[in-house]
């Protein structure tokens, strides 16, 4: 009796579970889903993306220069199967709706936004953060091999992508240059007027994306959370979806942050093939974390009229004061600055941030000017400000043209140029502040912290990666021309950043750089520059070889023995190599605590990179592969690194360093003090 009774009591539960399973199966067949919040929802997440305890899908968590992705875990079929008569498969219509919110740490600064994505793959590991929104990088942006359709909600302007404003919506295919874009907003169904919306309002808003397979049109519509879907879409673009994705594709979201911390949220999401997306129940949505403004007190209500009267009586004085201040902070603007305009700082803000460019804020001297530490008053972001004198060797306009291009560079091992300001005869450049200063003080300063071998090897690999980006991975070739330890800065976590592009040159791929005056730092200049005056990738490699010697040996490029004579550091290392004691050249302050194989590899690679003949030096991609252990180091031979070649280098540079034949006698005479 007890077992039949148990079965009878379990029948409703079994029936309920069966119906639930049938419903889930039907949803999978129909290619549709609805998430009114994400608590317990199965999504594929990577990067900073998480589901909060409250059910919010948080793509970025307020950390700078990171990315996050969230995808529906299973691929969806975007094509109807071919007919039995042998016809080809046809693309399907789809529709999605979602609720999003962006919470920026500072009301006056923002990071890139977020994007809804339809992609062949969920793997965006090679994509960059910042303006690339975690979807592409500088090398593959716009390539047809990317295979993605995205709708971006973008809160910064990038001249590189032709962005129209810092508050726009765009339809992107395989890259971040939008096929169609418009300012964020909606068309009011009652009046027909266009109503602007702020993506940074910290209020949730709705977006609908509809693809019509018959017309190949992608329509994007948005509205405040409390309004229904407007009849007129915000923007439309014709997209040949069959050329973008294949039979199956993933749907989800991508987001990234730049130098300003922001949080990007998705509160709800629905999707359907061959029909309108299911409605979202906005009453069930999790709360978006926002800053709630305080209501004005009764005291303010009483005092406000009195204060207004006092303000009117003070206007005459204020006009005079403002006029004087404007003359003090007067800035120069020209038409060419449109390309870099969104990154322009006001002189007043920089003046205040640096305490009037006071001496106590002076960090040091960089190429073309002094560098000051600053703190932006509103955001409290720490910055470094370089004042470039109008007496620089280059014309001001030519120099700024270089800055406009270099300002587009984005790499984790490059010091980020945040923006600029022009005021009378000065150009002010604003960079990320690096709290641990320059690398050279850790290599040469007395009583400084001694860098471990692991830190040194990571720094060498990081700078090699940045040079690879400059030489090979950006749209133009960038020659740094001044790679050295004092131009490598360290952030709070001792990560390295190559900076000071005051001498850099850019040129298009397939062309040669023009002959210029020989510039750079003695000890790092490739010997051929003395004759040709033409910088090249090989001359940057030479300087990088000397830089690696600096980091590994803890010595300056040009040494002085006890007799007052000079000796090239590369000569000293070469002599150690010939004697089979190359690792004896490693910084003695490490007291033998280093990876012998890594140190030997680096020192031998230094000799190759510092070869006096440009054609004998490896390219930067080969250097990176060697440092990563992806390829074996070529065997070094006496013929490859001969005394005559080193003497040739010294003769070309016209210096007084001793030739290689005298190295052996001088090694023991080099003092250990720095």
From Swiss-Prot:
InterPro entries, per database record: ConA-like_dom_sf, Kinase-like_dom_sf, L-type_Lectin-RKs, Lectin_legB_Mn/Ca_BS, Legume_lectin_dom, Prot_kinase_dom, Protein_kinase_ATP_BS, Ser/Thr_kinase_AS
Extracellular side: 28-301
EC number(s) recorded for this UniProt protein: 2.7.11.1
GO MF, one example: ATP binding
Signal peptide, first to last residue: 1-27
Membrane topology: Single-pass type I membrane protein
Modification type Phosphothreonine: residues: 511, 515-516, 521
Tissue expression profile of the protein: Expressed in root epidermal cells.
Effect after changing residue 386 to E: Loss of kinase activity
Key words, A-Z: ATP-binding, Cell membrane, Glycoprotein, Kinase, Lectin, Membrane, Nucleotide-binding, Phosphoprotein, Receptor, Serine/threonine-protein kinase, Signal, Stress response, Transferase, Transmembrane, Transmembrane helix
Reaction(s) the record says it catalyses: L-seryl-[protein] + ATP = O-phospho-L-seryl-[protein] + ADP + H(+); L-threonyl-[protein] + ATP = O-phospho-L-threonyl-[protein] + ADP + H(+)
Region (Legume-lectin like): 31-275
Post-translational modification: Autophosphorylated at Thr-511, Thr-515 or Thr-516, and Thr-521 in response to salt stress. Dephosphorylated by phosphatase 2A in response to salt stress.
Leftover remarks: Plants silencing SIT1 exhibit increased tolerance to salt stress.
Name assigned to this protein: L-type lectin-domain containing receptor kinase SIT1
Source species: Oryza sativa subsp. japonica
């Amino acid at each position: 009796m007890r077992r039949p009774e148990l079965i009878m009591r379990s029948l409703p539960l079994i029936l309920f579970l069966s119906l639930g399973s049938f419903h889930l199966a039907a949803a999978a067949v129909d290619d549709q889903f609805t998430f009114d919040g994400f608590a317990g929802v199965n999504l594929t997440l990577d990067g900073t993306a998480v589901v909060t305890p409250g059910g919010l899908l948080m793509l970025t968590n307020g950390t700078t220069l990171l990315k996050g992705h969230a995808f529906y875990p299973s691929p969806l079929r975007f094509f109807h199967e071919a007919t039995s008569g042998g016809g080809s498969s046809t693309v399907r219509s789809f529709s999605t709706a979602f609720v999003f919110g962006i919470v920026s740490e500072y009301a006056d600064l923002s990071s890139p936004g977020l994007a809804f994505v339809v992609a062949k793959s969920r793997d965006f590991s090679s994509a960059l953060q910042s303006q690339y929104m975690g979807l592409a990088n500088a090398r593959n942006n716009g390539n047809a091999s990317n295979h993605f359709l995205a709708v971006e909600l973008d809160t910064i302007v990038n001249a590189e992508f032709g962005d129209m404003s810092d508050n726009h919506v765009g339809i992107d295919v395989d890259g971040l240059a939008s096929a169609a874009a418009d300012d964020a907003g909606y068309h009011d169904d009652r009046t027909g007027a266009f109503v602007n919306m702020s993506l940074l309002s910290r209020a949730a808003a709705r977006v609908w994306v509809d693809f019509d397979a018959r017309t190949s049109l992608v329509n994007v519509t948005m509205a405040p959370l409390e309004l229904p879907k407007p009849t007129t879409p915000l923007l439309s673009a014709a997209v040949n979806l069959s050329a973008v994705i294949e039979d199956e594709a993933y749907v989800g979201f991508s987001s990234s942050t730049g130098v300003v911390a922001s949080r990007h949220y998705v509160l709800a999401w629905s999707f359907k093939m061959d029909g309108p997306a299911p409605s979202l129940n906005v009453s069930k949505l999790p709360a978006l974390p926002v800053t709630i403004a305080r209501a004005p007190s009764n005291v303010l209500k009483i005092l406000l009229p009195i204060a207004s009267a006092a303000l009117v009586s003070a206007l005459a004085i204020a006009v005079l004061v403002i006029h004087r201040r404007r003359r003090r902070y007067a800035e120069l603007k020209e038409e060419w600055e449109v390309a870099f305009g969104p990154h322009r700082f006001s002189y007043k803000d920089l003046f205040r941030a640096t305490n009037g460019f006071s001496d106590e804020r002076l960090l040091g001297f960089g190429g073309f000017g002094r560098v000051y530490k600053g703190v932006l008053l509103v955001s409290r972001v720490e910055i470094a400000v370089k004042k470039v004198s109008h007496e620089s060797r280059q014309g001001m306009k030519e120099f700024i043209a270089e800055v406009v291009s270099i300002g587009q560079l984005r790499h984790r091992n490059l010091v980020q140029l945040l923006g600029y300001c022009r005021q009378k005869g000065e150009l002010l450049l604003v960079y990320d502040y690096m709290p641990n200063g320059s690398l050279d003080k850790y290599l040469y300063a007395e009583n400084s912290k001694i860098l471990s071998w692991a830190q040194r090897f990571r720094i060498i690999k990081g700078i090699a990666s940045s040079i690879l980006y400059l030489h090979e991975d950006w749209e133009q070739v960038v020659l740094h021309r001044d790679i050295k330890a004092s131009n490598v800065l360290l952030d709070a976590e001792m990560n390295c950043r190559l900076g000071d592009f005051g001498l850099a040159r850019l040129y298009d791929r397939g062309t040669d750089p023009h002959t210029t005056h020989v510039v750079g730092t003695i000890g790092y200049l490739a010997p051929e520059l003395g004759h040709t005056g033409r910088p090249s990738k090989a001359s940057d490699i030479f300087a990088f070889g000397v830089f690696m010697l600096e980091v590994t040996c803890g010595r300056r490029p040009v040494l002085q023995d006890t007799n007052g004579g000079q000796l090239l550091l590369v000569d000293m290392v070469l002599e150690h190599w010939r004697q089979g004691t190359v690792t004896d050249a490693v910084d003695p302050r490490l007291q033998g605590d280093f990876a012998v194989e890594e140190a030997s590899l680096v020192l031998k690679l230094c000799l190759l990179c510092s070869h006096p003949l440009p054609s004998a030096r490896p390219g930067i991609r080969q250097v990176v592969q060697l440092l990563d252990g992806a390829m074996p180091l070529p065997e070094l031979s006496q013929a490859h690194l001969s005394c005559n070649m080193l003497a040739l280098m010294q003769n070309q540079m016209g210096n007084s360093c001793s030739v290689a034949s005298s190295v052996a006698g001088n090694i023991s005479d080099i003092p250990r003090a720095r």
